[in-house]
Amino acid sequence: MIQVREQYGNIYVRILDSQETFDYTLEKIRFIEGRTFNYETGEWMFGKESIGDLLLHFGNQIIWNQPLKEIIKNCDVNHELINKHLSWEDDDDFKTWTIKPYPYQKVGSHYLADRGKAAIFDGVGLGKTPQIIGACQILFNRNKARRVLIVTLNSLKRQWAKEIYKFAGEEAIAVYGSPAKRKKFIKGFASRSDIRYLVVNYETLRSAQYMKLIKEIPFDIVALDEAQKIKSGVTDKYLNIEPSLNAKACYDLKHIPYRFIATATPVQSKAEEVWSLFNFVDDSILGTWEVFRERYCKYSNRFGITGSFNLGELYYRIAPHFIRRTKEMPEIQQQLPKVQHSHVFLEMTDAQERIQDHLLMKMEEIKDTVRSLGSGTKVINGNLMNAQQAKEYYDGIIQGLQTFLIETCDAPQLLVHPEASQMSHNVISELGLSPKDIAKSPKLEQLKDFIKQLLNDEPSSKVVIFTEYERMARIIYEALPQSVLYTGQISDKEKDSVIERFREDPHTKFFISTRAGSTGLNLQVANYMVHFDLPYTATELEQRNGRIDRTGNAFSNITMYYYIMSESYDEHMLQLLFKKSELAKEILTGGVDKTSKGKDVNSLAMDRLLKKRAKSQGKMATG
């Protein structure tokens, strides 16, 4: 890989490779005429007329310090590859999009569409999803494709459907639910010509009954999101290696002509993982496993694969077939806004859905009880209460159930935590859920995946993570090495120590906090914030963001992530907080508050969820 900058009308090229690939890169540079070498800066110098040759030899393996259009400005350079590269940044293929992609995303989309079979390995937060959607849009526009199969993690299916609608304005069918419901979704997609995207998870492909239905649909494009799920795709009888179920299932989709993969963590220094990924993309890139093994793998019959070699050669074999950018690249930093807000919608587990439905049912029963209260006294739980006392008693129970709803979205295990109330323990007991049933937290899994990618891509980055609950903060703290914990339960001295360690220690990457850290702290050493759950007010949300979005932050771009469980209390809270935030802006700029007063966001979110549940049950009753 090379870095290119322009100065004083010349082009300066620096080789960024490790020793394994340096010689291959140097050999390519020596093919280009008119070069000189600057010993002081360690760069090769070319005239601008050599830009086309650089693109020819390095293509998507160039880091531009300035946008290409600026480099060739006021320069009479006419080269087919340059013109093609510049045309990739046009909006022609995205005229109907609600949200226009960034220039580097357009380049990524065109790269995928032009290659037809390729990989995108962009770093965290650069938008691999819109780039894949963009590649599909380009192929639609060229009449080369009509139907797309997206394969992703179970928790991200509805997130994909939302992203497709957000960018391209198209509906997508996400396959979820019971076996009968999943079959209905797939068959429904097959019978409709107005919907072009079907979104499934890897486990769905592993089912013979679903795969049979999917293979009957004439898909033109298949895209694997989080493609590291197929990194174990080797079949080797001599070494006694079997492919993973995910890889085996995905390889059955290689009849689909356009194939894309996306992941921020493509390989972990294992040559066999490279082969597994690119065997799906195009098996002609690296050939058969047996030939690949002899060329790149150290192995023995007793210990299996023990290492790799010839990695420089391997890199240049796959280089034309993938594109990778990170936020640390100057060209990317120039295109991104100072602050990005990204909502990550996750799929609820079966246990979470059952708990949420059970809690909503209890709330409805309590509300019915409150509505039936007369003006007289009642004996409740052995206590004599008047109507007002009874109402306050039931309001307290509802507030507790609201808390359980939020905790369920975060991690169901919070309901049976040693410090949890007997009422929350009873909820789990009433449903007959086992510790295994409630052990999984899609939010926590998403966070750990994000952290893994971040440490791989951006070792200098730091993250602030907020949650409303101390118990949740401790669970996150225990799951993340290199982290510090800031809560209202620690002393002032400990708080000062935690802040100093996060600011000063380069190895301390994650600051995990409850509401105690939402005001007054300067944490501008971080460039990412994760809202594990949402606060009750838009003001507090802005206060959280203000910990890193402040003067003095040395990072060019910072990103705020909001983790939201789809079709849950979370989602309703997000909608209401957004409306409240917009309202606050209107008031501050002279608008008038015409909305009703009284209920807080928490109560409104619960009311919305109850109404949605009642409506859903009404449909089921009449269906």
Residue map of PLM features:
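Conserved helicase ATPase motor motifs in RecA-like P-loop NTPase domains
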Residues: 124, 257-270
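A short helix-turn-beta junction within AAA+ P-loop NTPase domains corresponding to the substrate/partner-engaging
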Residues: 275-287
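Inter-lobe coupling linker of SF2 helicases/translocases
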Residues: 199-204, 209-218, 242-256, 262, ...
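SF2 helicase/translocase NTPase motor core
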Residues: 77-111, 117, 126-247, 255, ...
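Hydrophobic anchor at the beta1->P-loop junction of P-loop NTPases
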Residues: 120, 465
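Conserved SF2 helicase motif VI
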Residues: 538-558
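A short beta-strand element within the Helicase C-terminal
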Residues: 276, 522-534, 558-562
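Accessory DNA-engaging acidic/polar modules
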Residues: 1-98
